């Protein structure tokens, strides 16, 4: 069970970091005229 908990914590941490960086710096790949 501990493995499942550690995996969940790792995934959640990576997700939070990804969203923090993603929202902090808007993606430059998408054009301004796009969605």
Swiss-Prot record:
One of its GO terms (biological process) is photosynthesis. It comes from the Eukaryota. SUPFAM superfamilies: Photosystem II reaction center protein T, PsbT (SSF161029). It is found in: Plastid, Chloroplast thylakoid membrane. GO terms for cellular component: chloroplast thylakoid membrane; photosystem II reaction center. InterPro entries: PSII_PsbT (IPR001743), PSII_PsbT_sf (IPR037268). Keywords: Chloroplast, Membrane, Photosynthesis, Photosystem II, Plastid, Thylakoid, Transmembrane, Transmembrane helix. It is a single-pass membrane protein. Found at the monomer-monomer interface of the photosystem II (PS II) dimer, plays a role in assembly and dimerization of PSII. PSII is a light-driven water plastoquinone oxidoreductase, using light energy to abstract electrons from H(2)O, generating a proton gradient subsequently used for ATP formation. Belongs to the PsbT family. This is Photosystem II reaction center protein T. It comes from Gnetum gnemon (Spanish joint-fir). The gene is psbT.
């Amino acid at each position: 069970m501990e493995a499942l908990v550690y995996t969940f914590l790792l995934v959640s941490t990576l997700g939070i970091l990804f969203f923090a960086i993603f929202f902090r710096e808007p993606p430059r790949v998408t054009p301004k005229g796009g969605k």
